[in-house]
A protein has these predicted regions:
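Alpha/beta-hydrolase active-site loop
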Residues: 145-166
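Short beta-strand/loop motif that positions the catalytic acidic residue
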Residues: 254-256, 261-263, 267
Length: 324
């Protein structure tokens, strides 16, 4: 082999190495940014929006958070299927109606923020309330957020904990907001106890791949290929899950649990069509509520009366003596 040939081969190899590094390093960074435990959502973040309706809605949420934080609760804990300690807050209802709602918050959000506004609605209807802190958030253990992929199994574990603690005659609802909605929808196809009577899914996305593809295109003008595919591969190596490992659309095709879908028509983070697609695919009894003009996770606040009425009419078919 001539020195010239060796030089060409060496240069080609060096070029390939640089190209590989250029394609590999950014996806690893992107995976860590998207999935690693990080900064928790703060209410002040919401006020960066220029939309007045959203700001007014967030002021109401902020007020409700202050109220709910004054209530007494029991700290509870379970162990996930992969050995993580997961935390929750259990609020016992004096009505003792044998009803429990288990609530799952969204991406980098918190239990108080996502469920403060609906807390009184459930409490007045006799529900004990279990606010779950999702893995890789708050006091719960976990290095990586998995956008519902692993959280769906955590959901199943929380249901099994509830049935064991509150006995077999307890009626259970599952509620999720944003990534929490994706969590409960993905869990809907698992073998859950019959105690789960219905699911409330507010502004969930279809899968990690679909929501990250949307964010990359909208915010960074980047195509899914090759970056998102490489980032998914990096996630498989670093966090043990790929962005296409599960989807809400696939899950609800195989569920028999009644599902109430809600979404704001003006959602600036998760496109409303993602709930519509999941609703269309759902094999069980279902209802879709679109809140006109509502931004992300604000459907309940923006159209409270219509939301509660539509939700109540749906749930009254599955929960005994449910107050509409």
């Amino acid at each position: 082999m001539s020195d010239k040939t060796k030089g060409i081969i060496a240069a080609t190899a060096a070029g390939a190495a640089v190209a590989t590094a250029a394609l590999t390093v950014p996806p690893v960074i992107m995976q860590r940014v998207a999935c690693a435990r990080g900064r928790e959502f703060k209410l002040s973040d919401a006020f960066k929006s220029k939309d007045r309706k959203s700001k007014r809605s967030m002021l109401e949420v902020k007020r409700k958070v202050r109220e709910i934080k004054q209530r007494e609760y029991e700290s509870v804990e379970i162990e996930s299927y992969d050995g993580l300690k997961l935390k929750g807050k259990y609020f016992a209802n004096p009505q003792k109606a044998k009803r429990l709602i288990i609530c799952f918050h969204g991406y980098c959000s918190s239990d108080y923020h996502d469920f403060s506004y609906s807390f009184d609605y459930w409490f007045e209807r006799g529900f004990d309330i279990l606010l779950v802190t999702q893995r890789a958030h708050g006091e719960s253990e976990g290095k990586y957020i998995t956008f519902g992929i692993k959280e769906r199994f955590d959901c199943k574990s929380w249901v099994e904990y509830a049935v064991k603690r509150f006995k077999k005659n307890v009626e259970i609802l599952l509620e999720g907001v944003s990534m929490g909605a994706t969590t409960v929808l993905m869990a809907s196809s698992l073998k859950l106890p019959k105690n789960v009577k219905a699911i409330v899914a507010d502004c969930g996305f279809i899968s990690p791949f679909e929501i990250l593809k949307h964010v990359m295109k909208k915010s960074y003008k980047l195509p899914a290929f090759p970056y998102l595919y490489l980032t998914s591969a990096a996630s498989g190596l670093l966090a043990g899950f790929g962005f296409k490992d599960a989807s809400t659309v696939d899950a609800v095709k195989r569920t028999d649990i009644p599902i109430f879908f809600a979404h704001g028509s003006s959602d600036g983070f998760v496109p409303c069509r993602m709930s519509i697609d999941a609703f269309d695919a759902c094999a069980s009894d279902k209802k879709l509520f679109i809140a006109g003009g509502a931004d992300h996770a604000l459907s309940y606040v923006v159209q409270k009366s219509d939301y509660e009425r539509t939700l109540g009419e749906f749930l009254s078919k599955y929960i005994k003596n449910f107050k509409i």
